């Protein structure tokens, strides 16, 4: 249960980080 929760948490963090990174790249490409 704890391991599954940690995995879900990591996935959320990675997903949020990826979205933020994509947004930052788009802003640089199209300022």
Curated annotation (Swiss-Prot):
The keyword Oxidoreductase appears for this protein: yes
One Gene Ontology MF term: metal ion binding
Keywords from the named record: 4Fe-4S, Electron transport, FAD, Flavoprotein, Iron, Iron-sulfur, Metal-binding, Oxidoreductase, Transport, Ubiquinone
First-level EC class: oxidoreductase
EC number: 1.5.5.1
Subunit structure and binding partners: Monomer.
Name the UniProt record assigns to this protein: Electron transfer flavoprotein-ubiquinone oxidoreductase
Organism from which the protein derives: Paracoccus denitrificans
């Amino acid at each position: 249960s704890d391991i599954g929760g940690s995995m879900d948490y990591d996935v959320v963090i990675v997903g949020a980080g990826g979205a933020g990174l994509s947004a930052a790249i788009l802003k640089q490409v199209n300022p």
